[in-house]
Design a protein with these regions (language model features):
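Short acidic/glycine-rich loops and adjacent helix/strand connectors
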Residues: 1-249, 253, 257-266
């Protein structure tokens, strides 16, 4: 059969499958820009003409508001929607010629879940026929929509409020950490309580952004993944320091070379 997979919303590429052969498209880009959406439609048409194919079905992300989903639905073909994190696991299975049922761990930014919440830290039991959601990271309230992906301090305030359950404790902690003003914190807590522009999320990426802000590493990101990456680098640096400390005999002050198991001076 012939199938077209519409690709993701960010860093989009699509793919046309003909029986057991697959033809990925050139890089298209982020579909938040309408010019890129237009380029996606044009590139789909050109690749279909080049390959002389007429796809019978189109596959797209489960998110109803993704432009990739909208484009897929406009093709006039039967649409098969696949959950974002299930797709990640399927790609790993296909790459490794895995035909068995697996326990898949999929941690990333955000993806639309089958329950209408935002997923991103998932453990799924999966095969090519479907999946069962076995578990996830603890859900939290993500306030501010897409803005919170760039401003991790918003996630931080939400995490603090969720874990204290008390407005005054939240305001006190936020003030000590210098995350935002008292008024901003009050607004975010109110939004979380009333579910105003707030969604339940299990996104590992957003959790890392929030923790990065709480630890004073990055309050916000100026480019994609900045806060999470900075958190990773800080953790690696701390780990390196801990390993270095353990390699020094605190009594004699002599350093032990682990690889050769010999003592060195200095």
């Amino acid at each position: 059969g012939q199938v077209i997979a519409a690709g993701g919303e960010l860093k989009n590429t699509f793919c046309i499958g003909v029986d057991n052969r697959f033809y990925p498209s050139p890089y298209v880009g982020d579909l938040e820009d309408l010019r890129t959406v237009k380029a996606l439609k044009e590139t789909i048409g050109r690749l279909e003409t080049l390959l002389e194919v007429q796809p019978e079905v189109v596959v797209c992300d489960l998110h109803p508001k993704y432009n990739s989903t909208v484009v897929a639905q406009e093709l006039g073909l039967p649409v098969l929607k696949v959950q974002h994190h299930y797709a990640h696991i399927l790609s790993c299975m296909a790459e490794n010629d895995c035909e068995e049922k697996v326990i898949g761990v999929s941690f990333d930014g955000t993806g639309y879940g089958t329950d209408g919440t935002i997923w991103g830290g998932e453990i799924l039991i999966a095969d090519y026929q479907g999946f069962t959601r076995l578990g996830s990271i603890q859900p939290f309230v993500q306030v501010g929509g897409d803005v919170s992906a760039k401003e991790g301090w918003r996630i931080a305030v939400s995490l603090i409020w969720q874990n204290t359950g008390d407005l005054e404790k939240t305001l006190d902690t936020v003030q000590k950490l210098g995350l935002c003003t008292e008024q901003e914190a009050k607004v975010l807590v109110t939004m979380a309580q009333r579910k105003l522009n707030a969604v339940t999320s299990t996104s590992a990426g957003r959790l890392f952004d929030g923790v990065s802000a709480i630890l004073g590493i990055r309050r916000a990101s100026t480019f994609e993944g900045e806060a999470s990456t900075a958190l990773e680098f800080a953790a690696e640096a701390w780990r390196a320091q801990e390993i270095q400390k353990k390699n020094v005999d605190t009594v004699s002050g002599e350093r032990t070379d682990i690889k050769r198991n010999v003592e060195t001076t200095g």
